[in-house]
Design a protein with these regions (language model features):
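NAD(P)+-binding Rossmann beta1-loop-alpha1 motif at the extreme N-terminus of oxidoreductases
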Residues: 1-64, 89, 94-95, 125
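Hydrophobic beta-strand scaffold residues
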Residues: 27, 47, 116-117, 158, ...
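Amphipathic alpha-helical hairpins
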Residues: 11, 15, 53, 60-62, ...
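Helical "substrate-binding/catalytic lid" subdomain
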Residues: 166-269
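Rossmann-fold NAD(P) dinucleotide-binding segment
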Residues: 51-116
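Rossmann-fold dinucleotide-binding core
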Residues: 4, 96-176
Length: 269
């Protein structure tokens, strides 16, 4: 039985961490908001007061954090992993951030003997709880191969995508793709309804076409049922990372940029 650490027990992280416990691992956890960790503690997880304390109490550290600054703080800040004097020296980070940040943190932590395996998770909170996430990992292929049991506890589609930071690129790319698809479906359904075809009929058509996918049907289910579940949207952040990199690479992305603006407007209102 391994002892794993998990940092970040929000909507996605709590589900991922719970599945590590279900797989038979001991778990030590931390989060800035202790109340988010109560559910995991009731399942046997042990709460620690800092990333440093987590690292010193486990074999491998995992994390799911919301922002670049959070990842930098966990790795290099006060009470961060870089201060750990024993325990884990492998950090598997699933945070939705940009490539530049994880590569920069790795450059500093490697001086302390740490290895980072960069990950990203595709799916919503329900998939995290069910252990059916798509997981993309990058960094050392040997380290990836050695820790399949961790990944299989949290996801059912696991793909290695190359050099460190590529998993973040994949996450940003998937966010950009999803943003454009969301808007296209919404506009198309409004147009069809005005023309006399119901959203439900269009959903059936999509499910029996080459455009069918789990993601598209999930969006269509919401449109048809009109059951819009309010949840924090990370779309502008994740799409924004992709657009920032596009500007640096001088790659024009007008449709993605428009989708970014529409999601930003929705979030602001």
């Amino acid at each position: 039985m391994a002892t794993l650490g998990f940092i970040g027990t929000g909507g996605m992280g709590s589900g991922m961490a719970a599945n590590l416990i279900k797989a038979g691992n001991k778990l030590v956890i931390t989060d800035l908001r202790r109340e988010q960790s109560k559910g995991l503690e009731s399942q046997g997880a042990v709460f620690k007061d800092s990333p440093k304390a987590v690292a010193e109490s486990c074999d491998v550290v995992c994390s799911m954090l919301p922002y670049n600054q959070a990842v930098q703080a966990v790795g290099l800040g006060k009470g961060g992993l870089h201060e750990a004097t024993s325990g884990a020296k492998l950090w598997i980070d699933f945070s939705s951030i940009d490539k530049k940040t994880i590569v920069g943190v790795d450059a500093e932590l490697s001086k302390k003997g740490w290895t980072i395996l960069d990950g990203s998770a595709g799916g919503v909170e329900e998939a995290a709880a069910a252990g059916t996430l798509s997981l993309w990992l990058s960094g050392s292929k040997a380290v990836f191969d050695q820790h399949q049991d961790i990944f299989k506890a949290m996801g059912n589609k696991i793909i290695f995508v190359g050099e460190l930071g590529n998993a973040k690129l994949v996450k940003n790319a998937m966010a950009m793709f999803a943003a454009v698809v969301h808007l296209t479906l919404a506009e198309t359904c409004a147009w069809l309804k005005k023309g006399g075809l119901s959203e439900d009929t269009f959903r059936t058509i999509l499910k029996n076409s080459q455009q069918d996918s789990v993601a598209i049907d999930r969006i269509m289910e919401i449109i048809v049922s009109k059951k819009y579940k309010p949840r924090k949207s990370w779309m502008p952040k994740d799409v924004g990372f992709g657009l920032d990199m596009a500007r640096e690479m001088e790659v024009p992305m007008p449709f993605v940029a428009l989708a970014y603006q529409m999601f930003s407007i929705a979030q602001a209102t």
